[in-house]
C-alpha cells in the first residue's frame, strides 16, 4: 500500500511538473510565435521573437548608450529618449511591433485607430506592468470599467471651474514664495545662475499640498517628501529587468518601499479621519480643498443611494490622494521647466509672452480672468506640451480578438500609442514639426490638428486627464509671475539631455541665468 501511495505521489508530481513546464514553454515560446505569425499576416512587421527577453535587452543597451552624453540644442530628441522605437519604425514602418519580453507591443499611429482605442475604454484597458508602481499611486488612473466610471464621477466636482477659481490663491502663494527667493538671489548683481528644476518641483509640490489638503498643508508636505522618496526607489527598481516575485525579496530597497507605503497610508488616513469628523461637525472650511471636495462628493453619493457601495472607501480615498501628489506635481513641474528652457532658446517668444503678461497685469497680482485671456502664453504652453509631453506614450491591452478599422488584433497584445512620435510626425505637423513654433496653435488645438487625434499630451477621450485644466492654470500663474519679474537665458553650463523616467525630464537639470526686470 505504501508503495502504491509513493507511486501515485510520484506520478502526480511528474504530471504537475509536466503541466507547469508546458505552461512556461507556451508562455515563453509557443504563444509569442503564434502572435507573431498573426501580426505579420495583418501587415505588421518587427524583429523576430527572441526567447524570453524579446527586444528588452537591446532596449536597455540602446537607452544606456543614448543617455551617456547630452545632445546639441537643436538635435532630434527622439533617438535619445526612445531609440528602439525609432529604430523599429525606421526599419519596418509605422505598422510595426517590438517585443516586451514574450509580449508583442504594436505601434498604433493611425489617428482613426487611436481615436477608437481611447474612446472604447471598456475594450482597451491599461496593461499590468511592474506592480511596484502601485506603491506610488493607483486611484482613478489605474481603475478600469465600472470602477473607473464610479471614481471619475466622484472626483469630477473637485476640478469644476468654480472650484479651480477657489484654488488660485494657493497657487499664487506657492508661486510667490519661489519668485521671491529668486529675487533675493538676483538682487545683489542684477543676475544669477541657478538650476531652476528643483525650485519648480518645490513650487508644484507646494501647490498640490495646499490645494489638496488646505489647513493640513504641513502634513501634506511630509507625505509628499515620502512620495518623492518612493518615486526615486521605484525608478531605481525600474532600471532593471523585473521578474515576477522580485518585490517580495527582503532587500533593503523593498523593505524601505514597504515602510514608506505604510507611513503614507497612516498619515493620509489620519488627515482623512480628521476631515470626516470636521464634516460631521458642519465645519465649512473642510470643503474648500481637493480632499474636502472629494469627501463631500463621496458623502452625497452614498446618501443619495443609501448604500456605501456607491461611494469610495477610506483606502480608495487614500489612493486618490496619492495620485493627486504624483500626477499633479510631475506634470506641471515638467511643463514649467521645459517652457523656461524653450523660452531661453527662443528670446522672440519670451519677449512676446512678457509683453502680453505686462499688458494684461502690469506688476499686479494675476487674476483668473486675466490668466484665461493670455493667448500667447497659452500657445507657448501647448507647443511645449507637443515637443516635450510629460508622458511619452499610452499603452492598452486587449483580452479578446478585436477589430481596429480593417485590422484584426489578437488577445494578449499590447497597443502602444506613441504620443511623442505623433507630436513629431512631419506628415501631420509639416516640415517644421521638430521646431518650436507656438504660432501653429494660434487658432486652438482643434484647428491645428484638423480635428484628428494627433495631439494628446493629457490623453484623449473619456479618460482624458481630469487635472489638465488645473495644470494649465497653475502653469499660467507661475509663468506670468516669472515673466513679470525676470528675463532668462540658457547658462553655458546647461547640458541638453531630455530623458524619460516616468515623465520626460532634463537629465542634468535646467541651468539658466536670470536677469531682474525690477
UniProtKB/Swiss-Prot annotation:
The chain crosses the membrane at residues 2-22. Heme binds at residue 465. It holds the Pfam family p450. GO terms for molecular function: heme binding; iron ion binding; monooxygenase activity; oxidoreductase activity, acting on paired donors, with incorporation or reduction of molecular oxygen. Its cofactor is heme. The keyword Ubl conjugation does not apply. It is a single-pass membrane protein. Coiled coil: none annotated. InterPro entries: Cyt_P450, Cyt_P450_CS, Cyt_P450_E_grp-I, Cyt_P450_sf, Cytochrome_P450_Monooxygen. Its EC number is 1.14.-.-. Keywords: Heme, Iron, Membrane, Metal-binding, Monooxygenase, Oxidoreductase, Transmembrane, Transmembrane helix. GO terms for cellular component: membrane. It is found in: Membrane. Probable heme-thiolate monooxygenase. Belongs to the cytochrome P450 family. This is Cytochrome P450 CYP72A219. The lineage of its organism: Eukaryota, Viridiplantae, Streptophyta, Embryophyta, Tracheophyta.
